[in-house]
């Protein structure tokens, strides 16, 4: 189905963003109405953004994290541009999807997981803040990240996914910890076993810096993970490979579309006004994380950050 390409959006509010991971390059459960490419100070997003309507008539913005042809390595995903583009459209919450490896016997391939915590095993290759990187003139800001996922939306997403899949032979887990590794190679067996001793329950290559940047952008963020394999910690079985991952994802297409249909409209009800906790609890949080005095912030940094936060350094 072809949709018109637009240069700006003046239609109904787009409060919800959806980021698709491996195997999820489009959503069959929503109706595309337009496509838009947004230029940000940090470049272009991974893919053109599809503006679509849910079954309840709510407009959402969808982008494919690795591009529509899955041509972008995890370490090379333009995370800043992705988050900034969604913020520019007015997005207040993001529901992100990701394929993950399981580090626990009870989390079987094809199960869904709504994690609550993250262990960062990326290696400093990926830029993880809008406020500076490397030799760039920076602004010192320390966003709170103790609870990396929105604690208002996370239990709602969990209960919605659980209810949606109640008649399916698929378990739904929550209060789990996701390890984010650098990749693109999968774990060694020693690493996989180590992550288990650290308290890791699932593992992927994508949740960071995505979740950190969403926090800096004051966007509520929640992850829906689909287990595809048992990583490499089980000594009696073969280590994970791409064929196994893709087989699990294909088998879960129906469940993923069912989940999407229900979750998006349910989350919308929690963000449709600024007084709802999911929005209110994060709004203006960035203002209180900045330590650099506005009068010494470089003009270029001010210009870039105002794309994200129009109020930035105007005093």
Curated annotation (Swiss-Prot):
Single Gene Ontology MF annotation: S-methyl-5-thioadenosine phosphorylase activity
Protein name, per record: S-methyl-5'-thioadenosine phosphorylase
GO BP terms, alphabetized: glutamate biosynthetic process; L-methionine salvage from methylthioadenosine; purine ribonucleoside salvage
Residues engaged in binding phosphate: 22, 65-66, 98-99, 206
Keyword DNA-binding: no
Keywords: Cytoplasm, Glycosyltransferase, Nucleus, Purine salvage, Transferase
Species in which this protein is naturally found: Mycosarcoma maydis (Corn smut fungus)
Pathway: Amino-acid biosynthesis; L-methionine biosynthesis via salvage pathway; S-methyl-5-thio-alpha-D-ribose 1-phosphate from S-methyl-5'-thioadenosine (phosphorylase route): step 1/1
Family: Belongs to the PNP/MTAP phosphorylase family. MTAP subfamily.
Domain of life, source organism: Eukaryota
Subcellular location: Cytoplasm; Nucleus
Broad EC category: transferase
A GO CC term assigned to this protein in UniProt: cytosol
Site entry (Important for substrate specificity), positions: 187, 242
Pfam family, one: PNP_UDP_1
Annotated substrate binding sites: 205, 229-231
Chemical reaction(s) catalysed: S-methyl-5'-thioadenosine + phosphate = 5-(methylsulfanyl)-alpha-D-ribose 1-phosphate + adenine
HAMAP family: MTAP
Free-text function comment from the UniProt entry: Catalyzes the reversible phosphorylation of S-methyl-5'-thioadenosine (MTA) to adenine and 5-methylthioribose-1-phosphate. Involved in the breakdown of MTA, a major by-product of polyamine biosynthesis. Responsible for the first step in the methionine salvage pathway after MTA has been generated from S-adenosylmethionine. Has broad substrate specificity with 6-aminopurine nucleosides as preferred substrates.
EC number: 2.4.2.28
């Amino acid at each position: 189905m072809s949709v018109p390409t637009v240069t700006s959006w003046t239609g109904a509010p787009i409060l919800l963003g959806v980021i698709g991971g491996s195997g999820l390059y489009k959503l069959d459960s929503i109706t595309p109405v337009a496509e838009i490419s947004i230029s940000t100070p940090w470049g272009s997003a991974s893919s053109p953004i599809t503006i679509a309507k849910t079954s309840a008539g709510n407009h959402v913005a969808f982008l494919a994290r690795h591009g529509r042809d899955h041509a972008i390595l995890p370490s090379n995903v333009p995370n800043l541009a992705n988050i900034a583009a969604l913020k520019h459209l007015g997005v207040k919450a993001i529901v992100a999807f990701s394929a993950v490896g399981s580090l626990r016997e009870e989390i079987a391939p094809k199960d869904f997981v709504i994690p609550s915590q993250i262990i960062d095993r990326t290696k400093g290759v990926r830029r993880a803040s809008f406020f500076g990187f490397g030799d760039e003139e920076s602004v010192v800001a320390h966003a709170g990240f103790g609870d990396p996922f929105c604690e208002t939306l996370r239990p709602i997403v969990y209960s919605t996914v659980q209810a949606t899949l109640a008649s399916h032979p698929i378990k739904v887990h929550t209060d789990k910890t996701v390890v984010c590794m650098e990749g693109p190679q999968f774990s060694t067996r020693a690493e996989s076993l180590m992550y288990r001793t650290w308290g890791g329950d699932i593992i992927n290559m994508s949740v960071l810096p995505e979740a950190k940047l969403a926090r800096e952008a004051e966007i509520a963020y929640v992850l829906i993970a689909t287990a595809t394999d048992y990583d490499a910690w089980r000594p009696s079985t073969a280590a994970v490979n791409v064929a196994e991952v893709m087989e699990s994802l294909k088998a879960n297409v129906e469940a993923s579309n069912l989940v999407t249909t229900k979750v998006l409209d349910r989350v919308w009800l929690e963000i449709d006004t600024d007084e709802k906790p999911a929005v209110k609890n994060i709004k203006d949080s960035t203002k209180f994380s900045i330590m650099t005095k506005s009068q010494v912030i470089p003009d270029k940094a001010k210009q870039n950050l105002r794309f994200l936060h129009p109020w930035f350094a105007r005093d």
